[in-house]
Amino acid sequence: MSIDRTQPLLPVTQVQPRETSDIAQQTRKPSAQSKTPVSGTEVKLSDAQAKLMQPGSQDINVERVETLKQAIRSGQLTMDTGKIADALLKNVADDLKSS
């Protein structure tokens, strides 16, 4: 390998010609497009799954959510950061014990 035989760098505005070996490789590759039509998939949910997909409010305490929204809007919501940190640390410790 000789330093004298390297190709000079060209500015970004100029386009370098492709190597003929690159063009030959591209013509040999099979096309990614398929000529066969793609069929759709039909999904049938069971009654239990369909019920779970429906919005419900049984697991949400709507009154508590509204109280929290009002406290946030008025700037009166206070958070016990120590309690949050303790719960987070307990959660991490439990995860480390189980693994």
UniProtKB/Swiss-Prot annotation:
It comes from the Bacteria. Residues 1-42 are annotated as: Disordered. Keywords: Bacterial flagellum biogenesis, Repressor, Transcription, Transcription regulation. Residues 13-39 have a biased composition (Polar residues). Belongs to the FlgM family. It comes from Yersinia enterocolitica. This is Negative regulator of flagellin synthesis. Responsible for the coupling of flagellin expression to flagellar assembly by preventing expression of the flagellin genes when a component of the middle class of proteins is defective. It negatively regulates flagellar genes by inhibiting the activity of FliA by directly binding to FliA. GO terms for biological process: bacterial-type flagellum organization; negative regulation of DNA-templated transcription. InterPro entries: Anti-sigma-28_factor_FlgM_sf (IPR035890), FlgM (IPR007412), FlgM_C (IPR031316). The gene is flgM.
